[in-house]
Amino acid sequence: AEGNPVGRFAGYHIGAVAADGTKIAPRHFSYDWLNMAFTAAATYKMTKQFGFTADFTYNTQRPNMSNFAPAEMPNVDKITIPLGRAGIYFNNDWISLTSLFSYIAKTNNNSTLNLINPNNDKDIKAAALSYDIETIGWTTDAVVKPFKGFDFHFLFTYQSPKYKKYETGVTFSDGTTSGINATGNIVTEIPKVLIELDPSYNITKDLKVWASFRYFSKTYANIKNAYYFNGRWETFGGINWNVNKHLSLSGTVINFLNQTGAKGSISGAELVDKENAA
Protein backbone atom coordinates (compact mmCIF):
# COMPACT_ATOMS: atom_id res chain seq x y z
CA ALA A 1 0.00 0.00 0.00
CA GLU A 2 1.36 3.39 -0.98
CA GLY A 3 2.42 5.02 2.26
CA ASN A 4 -0.23 3.38 4.48
CA PRO A 5 0.63 -0.16 5.61
CA VAL A 6 -2.36 -2.48 5.89
CA GLY A 7 -2.66 -6.19 6.56
CA ARG A 8 -3.79 -8.82 4.08
CA PHE A 9 -7.53 -9.22 3.60
CA ALA A 10 -9.93 -11.24 1.44
CA GLY A 11 -9.58 -10.16 -2.17
CA TYR A 12 -6.22 -8.50 -1.57
CA HIS A 13 -4.69 -7.43 -4.91
CA ILE A 14 -3.23 -4.38 -6.61
CA GLY A 15 -6.07 -1.92 -7.00
CA ALA A 16 -8.16 -3.31 -4.13
CA VAL A 17 -9.36 -1.00 -1.37
CA ALA A 18 -8.88 -1.89 2.30
CA ALA A 19 -11.55 -1.38 4.96
CA ASP A 20 -9.93 1.90 6.04
CA GLY A 21 -10.04 3.21 2.47
CA THR A 22 -6.38 2.56 1.63
CA LYS A 23 -5.89 1.62 -2.02
CA ILE A 24 -3.42 -1.20 -2.61
CA ALA A 25 -0.73 -0.01 -5.02
CA PRO A 26 2.89 -0.88 -5.81
CA ARG A 27 5.49 0.89 -3.73
CA HIS A 28 8.68 1.67 -5.58
CA PHE A 29 12.06 1.72 -3.87
CA SER A 30 15.68 1.81 -4.95
CA TYR A 31 18.81 1.35 -2.85
CA ASP A 32 22.49 1.00 -3.64
CA TRP A 33 24.72 -0.24 -0.83
CA LEU A 34 28.30 -1.29 -0.32
CA ASN A 35 28.90 -3.99 2.30
CA MET A 36 32.32 -4.11 3.92
CA ALA A 37 34.33 -6.51 6.06
CA PHE A 38 37.44 -5.88 8.16
CA THR A 39 39.63 -8.40 9.95
CA ALA A 40 42.60 -8.04 12.28
CA ALA A 41 44.54 -10.66 14.24
CA ALA A 42 47.51 -10.65 16.60
CA THR A 43 49.57 -13.27 18.45
CA TYR A 44 52.13 -12.73 21.20
CA LYS A 45 54.48 -15.61 22.09
CA MET A 46 55.49 -15.66 25.74
CA THR A 47 57.46 -18.88 25.26
CA LYS A 48 57.94 -21.36 22.47
CA GLN A 49 54.79 -23.20 23.57
CA PHE A 50 52.61 -20.59 25.29
CA GLY A 51 51.20 -17.27 24.20
CA PHE A 52 48.28 -14.91 23.75
CA THR A 53 46.08 -14.59 20.70
CA ALA A 54 43.32 -12.23 19.62
CA ASP A 55 41.32 -11.45 16.51
CA PHE A 56 38.60 -9.03 15.50
CA THR A 57 36.17 -9.04 12.57
CA TYR A 58 33.72 -6.32 11.58
CA ASN A 59 31.12 -6.95 8.86
CA THR A 60 28.38 -4.73 7.48
CA GLN A 61 25.21 -5.81 5.70
CA ARG A 62 21.95 -4.34 4.45
CA PRO A 63 18.40 -5.77 4.22
CA ASN A 64 17.74 -8.32 1.48
CA MET A 65 14.70 -8.52 -0.80
CA SER A 66 12.65 -10.72 1.53
CA ASN A 67 12.72 -7.97 4.16
CA PHE A 68 10.57 -5.81 1.88
CA ALA A 69 7.72 -8.36 1.80
CA PRO A 70 5.53 -6.80 4.56
CA ALA A 71 3.37 -3.78 3.86
CA GLU A 72 5.60 -1.67 6.10
CA MET A 73 9.01 -0.68 4.82
CA PRO A 74 11.81 -2.42 6.75
CA ASN A 75 14.52 -0.69 8.70
CA VAL A 76 17.21 -0.02 6.09
CA ASP A 77 19.86 1.08 8.58
CA LYS A 78 23.25 -0.58 8.29
CA ILE A 79 23.54 -4.01 9.90
CA THR A 80 26.80 -4.38 11.81
CA ILE A 81 28.35 -7.63 13.03
CA PRO A 82 31.37 -7.14 15.31
CA LEU A 83 33.19 -10.24 16.55
CA GLY A 84 36.09 -10.09 18.97
CA ARG A 85 38.02 -12.95 20.59
CA ALA A 86 41.00 -13.03 22.93
CA GLY A 87 42.68 -15.71 24.96
CA ILE A 88 45.61 -18.05 25.37
CA TYR A 89 47.13 -20.99 23.55
CA PHE A 90 49.48 -23.80 24.56
CA ASN A 91 51.11 -26.37 22.27
CA ASN A 92 53.49 -29.25 22.84
CA ASP A 93 54.01 -32.78 21.54
CA TRP A 94 50.85 -34.23 23.06
CA ILE A 95 48.36 -31.33 23.40
CA SER A 96 47.19 -28.35 21.40
CA LEU A 97 45.01 -26.04 23.52
CA THR A 98 43.24 -22.75 22.87
CA SER A 99 40.95 -20.96 25.32
CA LEU A 100 39.19 -17.77 24.21
CA PHE A 101 36.68 -15.26 25.51
CA SER A 102 34.52 -13.79 22.78
CA TYR A 103 31.93 -11.12 22.05
CA ILE A 104 29.62 -11.03 19.05
CA ALA A 105 26.63 -8.88 18.19
CA LYS A 106 24.37 -8.18 15.24
CA THR A 107 22.38 -4.98 14.94
CA ASN A 108 19.23 -4.17 12.97
CA ASN A 109 18.02 -7.70 12.33
CA ASN A 110 14.87 -7.37 10.22
CA SER A 111 11.98 -9.72 10.88
CA THR A 112 8.20 -9.90 10.59
CA LEU A 113 5.76 -11.06 13.26
CA ASN A 114 2.12 -11.92 12.68
CA LEU A 115 0.21 -10.37 15.59
CA ILE A 116 -3.33 -11.52 16.38
CA ASN A 117 -6.20 -9.30 17.46
CA PRO A 118 -7.07 -10.49 21.00
CA ASN A 119 -10.76 -9.82 20.22
CA ASN A 120 -10.76 -11.66 16.87
CA ASP A 121 -8.32 -14.50 16.26
CA LYS A 122 -8.96 -14.27 12.51
CA ASP A 123 -7.74 -10.68 12.42
CA ILE A 124 -3.99 -11.02 11.89
CA LYS A 125 -1.63 -8.23 11.04
CA ALA A 126 2.04 -8.40 10.08
CA ALA A 127 4.37 -6.17 12.06
CA ALA A 128 7.84 -5.27 10.84
CA LEU A 129 10.52 -5.53 13.51
CA SER A 130 14.15 -4.49 13.80
CA TYR A 131 16.16 -5.78 16.76
CA ASP A 132 19.69 -6.52 17.96
CA ILE A 133 21.26 -9.63 19.43
CA GLU A 134 24.51 -10.01 21.35
CA THR A 135 26.39 -12.53 23.44
CA ILE A 136 29.60 -12.99 25.34
CA GLY A 137 31.10 -16.44 25.44
CA TRP A 138 33.97 -18.68 26.38
CA THR A 139 35.36 -21.46 24.21
CA THR A 140 38.06 -24.00 25.01
CA ASP A 141 39.30 -26.21 22.19
CA ALA A 142 41.89 -28.95 22.72
CA VAL A 143 43.39 -31.85 20.78
CA VAL A 144 45.16 -34.42 22.96
CA LYS A 145 47.48 -37.18 21.68
CA PRO A 146 48.38 -39.22 24.79
CA PHE A 147 49.84 -42.15 22.84
CA LYS A 148 50.60 -43.12 19.26
CA GLY A 149 47.57 -43.52 17.03
CA PHE A 150 45.05 -42.02 19.47
CA ASP A 151 43.61 -38.51 19.15
CA PHE A 152 41.02 -36.90 21.39
CA HIS A 153 39.34 -33.62 20.45
CA PHE A 154 37.49 -31.66 23.13
CA LEU A 155 35.43 -28.51 22.59
CA PHE A 156 33.50 -26.59 25.24
CA THR A 157 31.50 -23.42 24.58
CA TYR A 158 29.44 -21.27 26.92
CA GLN A 159 27.37 -18.44 25.50
CA SER A 160 24.28 -16.42 26.41
CA PRO A 161 22.76 -14.81 23.29
CA LYS A 162 20.02 -12.31 24.12
CA TYR A 163 17.59 -10.12 22.23
CA LYS A 164 17.98 -6.34 22.48
CA LYS A 165 15.35 -3.77 21.46
CA TYR A 166 12.95 -6.59 20.56
CA GLU A 167 9.75 -4.56 20.67
CA THR A 168 6.94 -3.98 18.16
CA GLY A 169 3.18 -3.57 18.03
CA VAL A 170 0.20 -2.94 15.73
CA THR A 171 -3.21 -1.31 15.91
CA PHE A 172 -6.12 -3.21 14.36
CA SER A 173 -9.06 -1.70 12.48
CA ASP A 174 -11.25 -1.90 15.62
CA GLY A 175 -8.72 0.13 17.59
CA THR A 176 -7.35 -2.85 19.53
CA THR A 177 -3.59 -2.93 19.99
CA SER A 178 -1.27 -5.92 20.25
CA GLY A 179 2.46 -5.99 20.80
CA ILE A 180 5.47 -7.91 22.01
CA ASN A 181 8.51 -7.10 24.13
CA ALA A 182 11.16 -9.83 24.27
CA THR A 183 14.12 -7.62 25.16
CA GLY A 184 16.51 -9.55 27.39
CA ASN A 185 15.15 -12.97 26.44
CA ILE A 186 17.44 -15.76 25.25
CA VAL A 187 17.55 -16.16 21.47
CA THR A 188 15.45 -19.12 20.36
CA GLU A 189 17.03 -22.42 19.26
CA ILE A 190 20.51 -21.43 20.54
CA PRO A 191 21.94 -23.49 23.45
CA LYS A 192 24.00 -21.87 26.18
CA VAL A 193 26.37 -24.83 26.47
CA LEU A 194 27.94 -26.85 23.65
CA ILE A 195 30.26 -29.81 24.19
CA GLU A 196 32.04 -31.95 21.60
CA LEU A 197 34.01 -35.10 22.43
CA ASP A 198 35.72 -36.71 19.43
CA PRO A 199 38.01 -39.69 20.09
CA SER A 200 39.69 -41.52 17.21
CA TYR A 201 42.24 -44.32 16.91
CA ASN A 202 44.37 -45.44 13.97
CA ILE A 203 44.52 -49.23 14.21
CA THR A 204 46.93 -49.16 11.28
CA LYS A 205 48.05 -46.31 9.05
CA ASP A 206 45.15 -47.17 6.73
CA LEU A 207 42.43 -48.16 9.23
CA LYS A 208 40.83 -45.66 11.60
CA VAL A 209 37.89 -45.90 14.02
CA TRP A 210 36.27 -42.80 15.43
CA ALA A 211 33.33 -41.52 17.45
CA SER A 212 31.72 -38.17 18.13
CA PHE A 213 29.60 -37.12 21.12
CA ARG A 214 27.89 -33.73 20.98
CA TYR A 215 25.89 -32.09 23.75
CA PHE A 216 23.45 -29.21 23.32
CA SER A 217 21.94 -27.68 26.46
CA LYS A 218 18.37 -26.46 26.85
CA THR A 219 17.05 -24.37 23.94
CA TYR A 220 14.02 -22.11 23.95
CA ALA A 221 11.29 -22.87 21.43
CA ASN A 222 9.57 -19.49 21.31
CA ILE A 223 10.48 -15.82 21.52
CA LYS A 224 8.90 -15.30 24.94
CA ASN A 225 10.97 -18.21 26.38
CA ALA A 226 7.77 -19.89 27.58
CA TYR A 227 8.56 -23.24 25.95
CA TYR A 228 11.87 -25.05 25.78
CA PHE A 229 13.48 -28.33 24.80
CA ASN A 230 15.69 -30.13 27.31
CA GLY A 231 19.36 -30.65 26.61
CA ARG A 232 20.29 -33.57 24.39
CA TRP A 233 23.22 -35.64 23.16
CA GLU A 234 23.95 -36.59 19.57
CA THR A 235 26.28 -39.51 18.86
CA PHE A 236 28.08 -40.69 15.75
CA GLY A 237 30.68 -43.33 15.08
CA GLY A 238 32.41 -44.96 12.19
CA ILE A 239 35.37 -46.56 10.51
CA ASN A 240 37.55 -45.35 7.64
CA TRP A 241 39.67 -47.72 5.56
CA ASN A 242 42.07 -46.67 2.84
CA VAL A 243 42.18 -49.92 0.90
CA ASN A 244 44.69 -48.63 -1.63
CA LYS A 245 45.44 -45.45 -3.55
CA HIS A 246 42.39 -46.06 -5.74
CA LEU A 247 39.83 -47.10 -3.13
CA SER A 248 38.68 -45.78 0.26
CA LEU A 249 35.80 -47.21 2.26
CA SER A 250 33.94 -45.75 5.23
CA GLY A 251 30.96 -46.58 7.36
CA THR A 252 29.04 -44.37 9.81
CA VAL A 253 26.52 -45.16 12.53
CA ILE A 254 24.26 -42.33 13.70
CA ASN A 255 22.81 -42.20 17.23
CA PHE A 256 24.45 -45.47 18.27
CA LEU A 257 23.56 -44.80 21.94
CA ASN A 258 19.88 -44.31 21.03
CA GLN A 259 19.70 -40.80 22.47
CA THR A 260 16.42 -38.88 22.30
CA GLY A 261 15.68 -35.17 22.19
CA ALA A 262 14.20 -32.36 20.13
CA LYS A 263 15.24 -29.02 18.70
CA GLY A 264 13.66 -26.17 16.75
CA SER A 265 10.61 -24.04 17.47
CA ILE A 266 6.92 -24.64 18.13
CA SER A 267 4.74 -23.35 15.31
CA GLY A 268 2.03 -20.95 16.44
CA ALA A 269 3.55 -20.47 19.91
CA GLU A 270 5.86 -17.56 19.12
CA LEU A 271 3.96 -15.05 21.26
CA VAL A 272 2.84 -17.28 24.16
CA ASP A 273 3.88 -15.88 27.56
CA LYS A 274 5.30 -18.00 30.38
CA GLU A 275 2.15 -17.31 32.40
CA ASN A 276 -0.04 -18.76 29.64
CA ALA A 277 2.14 -21.74 28.70
CA ALA A 278 0.41 -25.06 29.28
Language-model-detected regions and their locations in the chain:
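Short, intrinsically disordered, charge-balanced linker/junction segments flanking boundaries
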Residues: 1-3, 40, 48, 66-71, ...
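Gram-negative outer-membrane beta-barrel transporters
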Residues: 2-10, 14, 30-32, 41-61, ...
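A subset of solvent-exposed loop/turn segments in beta-rich extracellular surface proteins, enriched
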Residues: 2-21, 115, 268-277
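Extracellular loop and loop/strand-boundary signature of outer-membrane beta-barrel proteins
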Residues: 19-29, 69-76, 83, 123-129, ...
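Hydrophobic, lipid-facing positions within transmembrane beta-strands of outer-membrane proteins
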Residues: 36-40, 82-86, 136-140, 193-197, ...
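Short acidic, glycine/proline-rich loop/turn micro-motifs
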Residues: 65-70, 111-113, 165-168, 221-225, ...
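Outer-membrane beta-barrel domain signature, strongest for Gram-negative TonB-dependent receptors
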Residues: 83-100
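C-terminal beta-signal and adjacent terminal beta-strands/loops
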Residues: 112, 217-220, 240-278
